[in-house]
Structures are given as structure tokens and as C-alpha cells.
């Protein structure tokens, strides 16, 4: 927490600063008046340009919105056609599926799955039961009383 020491200006420094601001002041005022006249012209030109840009953007935006609405209407019509034809397409798909050839394919797949399950069951069953060793045991199996 440092204290800020405020240095006071001596009378000579105050006079020098005041004269400097007085000498620069009228130039700034003159420049400001000139810029005010030119600035108003520039400001009105900028405002006009901004208005033209805005009108151009709004016109372009309106055209883009109209094109998007037209595209959306076409997509909606296409979707309605698809939905209207959906029951007929489903009926056609069902009649094509009902062939005897597909029935045999499903029966073959079911038989293969059952055979695979039987093989997996026998492998698991054998792994849970230890196989007897062909060698005689090295330790007596029956404990002595």
C-alpha cells in the first residue's frame, strides 16, 4: 500500500501550461469547425451509403427467403408423396418376402445356431470337469486314519 505523492505545479509551470493550451486552442477550434462542415458531408454520405447497403441486403434477403420457401414447398410435396406411397411400398415388400426360399434359409440359420450352441455347451462342460491323468498319483489319495 504505497501512498501516491501529489506534486504541485509551480506558478511558472502553471503559466507555461496555460499559454501552451491557449496557443493550441484556437487552432483546434478552427480545425474542428472545418471538420464539422466536411464531417457533416461525410456523415451524410456514409448514412446514404449505409441506407443503400441496408436496402440491398434486405432485397437480397427477401429473394433468399422466397427461394428457401420455394425449396421447402418442393421438399414438403416430395415428402407427402413418399408418405402417401408408403403403404403400397410396404405391401409390395411383404409380398416379395413371402417366398419358400427364404423359409429354407431361416431354417438353415436356425440349425447352424443350434449346432453351434451344442458345441459350445460340450466345450464348457468338458472344461469344468478335469480329465483324469494317465499317470498314477504321486501322493496317496486316501488319507490314513
UniProtKB/Swiss-Prot annotation:
An example GO biological process term is: cell wall biogenesis
Primary location class: membrane
Classify the protein's membrane topology as the record does: Single-pass membrane protein
The UniProt family comment states: Belongs to the CwsA family.
InterPro entries the record matches: CwsA
Keyword tags: Cell cycle, Cell division, Cell membrane, Cell shape, Membrane, Transmembrane, Transmembrane helix
This one is known as: Cell wall synthesis protein CwsA
Read off the Pfam families from this record.
Answer: CwsA (PF10814)
Species classification: Bacteria, Bacillati, Actinomycetota, Actinomycetes, Mycobacteriales
**Gene designation per UniProt:** cwsA
Q: Which GO terms describe its cellular component?
A: plasma membrane
Amino acid at each position: 500500500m504505497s501512498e501516491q505523492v501529489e506534486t504541485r505545479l509551480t506558478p511558472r509551470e502553471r503559466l507555461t501550461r496555460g499559454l501552451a493550451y491557449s496557443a493550441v486552442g484556437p487552432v483546434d477550434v478552427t480545425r474542428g469547425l472545418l471538420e464539422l462542415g466536411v464531417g457533416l458531408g461525410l456523415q451524410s454520405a456514409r448514412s446514404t451509403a449505409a441506407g443503400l447497403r441496408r436496402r440491398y441486403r434486405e432485397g437480397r434477403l427477401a429473394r433468399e427467403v422466397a427461394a428457401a420457401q420455394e425449396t421447402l414447398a418442393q421438399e414438403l410435396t416430395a415428402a407427402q408423396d413418399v408418405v402417401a406411397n408408403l403403404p403400397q411400398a410396404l405391401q409390395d415388400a411383404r409380398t416379395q418376402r413371402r417366398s419358400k426360399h427364404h423359409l429354407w434359409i431361416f431354417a438353415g440359420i436356425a440349425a447352424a445356431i443350434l449346432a453351434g450352441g451344442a458345441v459350445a455347451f460340450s466345450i464348457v462342460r468338458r472344461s469344468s470337469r478335469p480329465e483324469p491323468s494317465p499317470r498314477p498319483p504321486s501322493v496317496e489319495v486316501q488319507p490314513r486314519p
